[in-house]
């Protein structure tokens, strides 16, 4: 499927049993799997948080306008061309401990820095707006080559963006110094709320 971007937008608590109750049956739910992408791990973590009543966080849908659809069969339809209605902001939002949270997820294979080109100006503006309203904003950054995950506060990202004029890169050491490491966990495999808790403690 061809996707066309709009012009100018290139750039807590735990329960004893991790179960999900559905109707008359009770299912054991596992929320960890190694070797998957960052977004997949976040999605599984969000499922775990929801099942255990820790937080309600969802991936934001991306609105598109369909231009062309093929019908290879009467019972099937395949979108072959579409474009985004508007520039996307961040990947996830929800509610945690009575607070609105909003964050993005980024990966890099670079071992020494994180390129700011991974962000767009409208995303930085969006995170600034979240902070101005008392919300919680951050970025989950994964250094894939190092298998390290960090919760990087939006306030630090905004400061670096302004300092570097949205160009160049944030050094790995800067991110390590100003971020909160996401500890390795079995279930979920990416327990990012543990790092968010530490971030909130430090900010207050």
Curated annotation (Swiss-Prot):
Family (UniProt): Belongs to the RecU family.
Annotated Gene Ontology cellular component terms: cytoplasm
Obligatory cofactor(s): Mg(2+)
Function: Endonuclease that resolves Holliday junction intermediates in genetic recombination. Cleaves mobile four-strand junctions by introducing symmetrical nicks in paired strands. Promotes annealing of linear ssDNA with homologous dsDNA. Required for DNA repair, homologous recombination and chromosome segregation.
Molecular-function GO term, any one: endonuclease activity
EC number(s) on file: 3.1.21.10
Localization terms from the record: Cytoplasm
Sites marked Transition state stabilizer: 106
Cofactor note: Binds 1 Mg(2+) ion per subunit.
Broad EC category: hydrolase
Primary residence: cytoplasm
Residues spanning the membrane: none
Keywords: Cytoplasm, DNA damage, DNA recombination, DNA repair, Endonuclease, Hydrolase, Magnesium, Metal-binding, Nuclease
One Gene Ontology biological process: DNA repair
Binding-site list for Mg(2+): 89, 91, 104, 123
Name recorded for this polypeptide: Holliday junction resolvase RecU
Gene3D superfamilies with a match to the protein in the record: 3.40.1350.10
Organism classification: Bacteria, Bacillati, Bacillota, Bacilli, Lactobacillales
Any Pfam family the entry gives: RecU
Catalysis performed (reactions): Endonucleolytic cleavage at a junction such as a reciprocal single-stranded crossover between two homologous DNA duplexes (Holliday junction)
